[in-house]
């Protein structure tokens, strides 16, 4: 499999914004923490045959580095400190941190090393896997087909929103990790830029080159790692929320709620956190139920929900986003992050349902017990039981 050996990636910034935001926080607070992460294909795709091609791409990634113009652009953003950016200038991907193999047809990938370095592998590696697989499966598919599909969806979207006040509707591109290709994502984002309700992208490379706002705060791994960083498991989620505010006291204030279910999150999300964080992000479970819980929680704490933002990002498409907007727009600020349904929405192309998730921190297990049982990941059943007990979740379904 060498016919497509040219590198998929061309920029270190071709990744999700929250990876750099988290990396800076890890650089400042957890420099010596080590982690391990593993690849999962949630579908039935046998991707092992692509292992050699993916391994080639992993090797090519060691040549990526922060360019001078990229460094200058990051320096002008309010999020980053000079010590981190100077370190990032010297950063190089280390392929020795990645093992890729074909396990009886299944693609097996494991990452391990210092968290400050390993943290950057996930998004570009998933984008590489997605693009390599689609290159082989759909060699005749091109950007025009993706754009035609989007134009058709935008016509439907206009009809769906006719007569609706869309002034509070905000859409973001979250499509890097499962995109059909880098070229498709850029084309889709350029088209969406023409719409007044499109507010930005999670992709730092596209944000820089297209003069867009980079969007993103933190991911599940921030909360998962704290399960072992925090000396008290029951306090680990609060420790993660507090450490984030230490790094970003006045910005990047959207908290992810489903590392250990929304109910457990809200028990930890008291009035100080709820006041200081700008809002919450939904990534699993029923979105209407979740949003109602969030609004009720703010009201219970005496906080006006209209002063907060709910971000929906779980398996969204334009139609679902409009339904949620109709339901919630009069009561709370809203943003919608759409990924796969924008950047891999092409007839006859099956998007990959692939993830890379943290499984260990400092040699000990971590877990994600989300509001969608199929998204649960952990090897260690005893640790899952301990986590359920610590967060008073006796009925959570077992880890898969």
Swiss-Prot record:
NCBIfam families: NAPRTase, PRK05321.1
Enzyme class: ligase
Molecular function GO labels: nicotinate phosphoribosyltransferase activity
Pfam families: NAPRTase, NAPRTase_N
Function: Catalyzes the synthesis of beta-nicotinate D-ribonucleotide from nicotinate and 5-phospho-D-ribose 1-phosphate at the expense of ATP.
InterPro entries (UniProt xref): N/Namide_PRibTrfase, NAPRTase_N, Nic_PRibTrfase, Nic_PRibTrfase-Fam, Nicotinate_pribotase-like_C
Pathway stated in the Swiss-Prot or TrEMBL entry: Cofactor biosynthesis; NAD(+) biosynthesis; nicotinate D-ribonucleotide from nicotinate: step 1/1
Residues in coiled coil: none
Post-translational modification: Transiently phosphorylated on a His residue during the reaction cycle. Phosphorylation strongly increases the affinity for substrates and increases the rate of nicotinate D-ribonucleotide production. Dephosphorylation regenerates the low-affinity form of the enzyme, leading to product release.
EC number assigned by the record: 6.3.4.21
Keywords: Ligase, Phosphoprotein, Pyridine nucleotide biosynthesis
Family that this chain belongs to: Belongs to the NAPRTase family.
GO cellular component: cytosol
SUPFAM superfamilies with a match to the protein in the record: Nicotinate/Quinolinate PRTase C-terminal domain-like, Nicotinate/Quinolinate PRTase N-terminal domain-like
Modified residues (Phosphohistidine): 220
Catalytic reaction equation(s): nicotinate + 5-phospho-alpha-D-ribose 1-diphosphate + ATP + H2O = nicotinate beta-D-ribonucleotide + ADP + phosphate + diphosphate
Signal sequence, start to end: none
Protein name as it appears in the record: Nicotinate phosphoribosyltransferase
Gene Ontology biological process: NAD biosynthetic process via the salvage pathway
């Amino acid at each position: 499999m060498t016919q497509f050996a040219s590198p998929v990636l061309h920029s270190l910034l071709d990744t999700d914004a929250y990876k750099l935001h988290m990396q800076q926080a890890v650089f400042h607070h957890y420099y010596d923490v080590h982690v391990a992460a593993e690849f999962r294909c949630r579908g039935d795709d046998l991707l092992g045959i692509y292992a050699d091609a993916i391994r080639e791409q992993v090797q090519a990634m060691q040549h990526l580095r922060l360019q001078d113009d990229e460094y200058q652009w990051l320096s002008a953003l309010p999020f980053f400190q000079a010590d981190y950016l100077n370190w990032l200038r010297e950063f190089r991907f280390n392929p020795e941190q990645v093992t890729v193999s074909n396990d009886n047809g299944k693609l097996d990938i494991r990452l391990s090393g210092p968290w400050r370095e390993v943290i950057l592998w996930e998004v570009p590696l998933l984008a590489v896997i997605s693009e390599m697989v689609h290159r082989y499966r759909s060699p005749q598919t091109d950007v025009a087909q993706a754009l035609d599909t989007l134009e058709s969806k935008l016509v439907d979207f206009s009809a769906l929103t006719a007569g609706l006040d869309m002034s509070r509707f905000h859409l973001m591109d979250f499509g890097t990790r499962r995109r059909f290709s880098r070229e498709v994502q850029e084309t889709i984002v350029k088209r969406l830029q023409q719409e007044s309700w499109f507010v930005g992208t999670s992709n730092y490379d596209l944000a820089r080159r297209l003069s867009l706002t980079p969007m993103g705060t933190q991911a599940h791994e921030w909360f998962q790692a704290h399960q072992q960083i925090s000396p008290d498991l029951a306090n680990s989620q609060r420790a993660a929320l507090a450490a984030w505010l230490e790094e970003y006291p006045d910005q990047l204030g959207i908290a992810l709620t489903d590392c250990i279910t929304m109910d457990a999150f809200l028990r930890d999300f008291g009035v100080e956190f709820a006041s200081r964080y700008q809002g919450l992000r939904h990534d699993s479970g029923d979105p209407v139920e979740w949003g109602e819980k969030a609004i009720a929680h703010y009201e219970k704490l005496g906080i006006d929900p209209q002063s907060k933002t709910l971000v929906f990002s779980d398996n969204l498409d334009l139609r679902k986003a409009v339904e949620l907007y109709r339901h919630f727009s009069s009561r709370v600020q809203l943003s919608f992050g759409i990924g796969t349904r924008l950047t891999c929405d092409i007839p006859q192309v099956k998007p990959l349902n692939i993830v890379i998730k943290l499984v260990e921190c400092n040699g000990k297990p971590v877990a994600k017990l989300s509001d969608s049982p199929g998204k649960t990941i952990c090897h260690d059943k005893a640790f899952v039981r301990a986590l359920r007990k610590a967060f008073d979740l006796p009925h959570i379904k077992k880890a898969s």
